[in-house]
Amino acid sequence: MDIEAYFERIGYQSSRNKLDLEELTEILQHQIRAIPFENLNIHCGESMELNLEVIFDQVVRKKRGGWCLQVNHLLYWALTKMGFEATMLGGYVFNTPANKYSSGMIHLLVQVTLSGKDYIVDAGFGRSYQMWEPLELTSGKDQPQVPAIFRLTEENGTWYLDQIRREQYVPNQEFVNSDLLEKNKYRKIYSFTLEPRTIEDFESINTYLQTSPASLFTSKSFCSLQTLEGVHCLVGSTLTYRRFSYKDNIDLVEFKSLTEEEIEDVLKTIFGVSLERKLVPKHGDRFFTI
């Protein structure tokens, strides 16, 4: 696995190699704008693998994306290879309908230490919940970014990531009540501890998430990619584009229903994804917002 191939995949050309916050931010932003957050393998009859060689082949060579356990694993590898002091952490995702965090550790994120200061880096949450910059590991501090205001809070050794969102405007009246729209202005995202993890810690949950009928990931096919101004999402056959702050403190959210032929074209043109197997788009009843 070649770090230069990874840099080429994310379009990163700087040779600064200063291992500072600016470079860390650039790596994160290049990755989230080049590598989609997606689970399409599941809906093409293929598996979601955790092996780094397989992930590298899928994401870097075949120009696909992946879910958090894959794209953040790749990010962790790249940062470590560059010389950053990085640690894998495990997260518990907030389930809005149940109003509680997941019982299983279903999210992988990365902690990076720079000159004695800790940051959270995550390229694998996608949609409008995706951070665009590393977050200072500081409790109770509002950290405004382009997508929203993020806030980390620590309580008895557990950290909580929340988001304060803008109002949203949906011009197409057909979709104003879409189940894909986030209704909460204050949104809990996930919790985590600072206990170091290895990829092996996620093996059983990786299998569960792609096989269980109760899993969000078997319920919906999705692909999400950040841009310079917002984020594209394809859920089932519904395409959305959210433009952050198109007006003062308001996001613009555009919807479009696609035909089967349009889906294949959109995956290639918007997300840069060419599938080897036929996708069966799915929009099941599990809660999932963009």
Curated annotation (Swiss-Prot):
The active site is at residues 68, 107, 122. GO terms for molecular function: arylamine N-acetyltransferase activity; N-acetyltransferase activity; N-hydroxyarylamine O-acetyltransferase activity. It is an enzyme of class 2 (transferase). CoA binds at residues 103-104, 208. Pfam families: Acetyltransf_2. Keywords: Acyltransferase, Cytoplasm, Transferase. InterPro entries: Arylamine_N-AcTrfase, Arylamine_NAT_domain_sf, Papain-like_cys_pep_sf. Substrate binds at residues 106-107. Disulfide bonds: none annotated. Its EC number is 2.3.1.5, 2.3.1.118. Belongs to the arylamine N-acetyltransferase family. Catalyzes the N- or O-acetylation of various arylamine and heterocyclic amine substrates. Participates in the detoxification of a plethora of hydrazine and arylamine drugs. This is Arylamine N-acetyltransferase 2. It comes from Rattus norvegicus (Rat). The lineage of its organism: Eukaryota, Metazoa, Chordata, Craniata, Vertebrata.
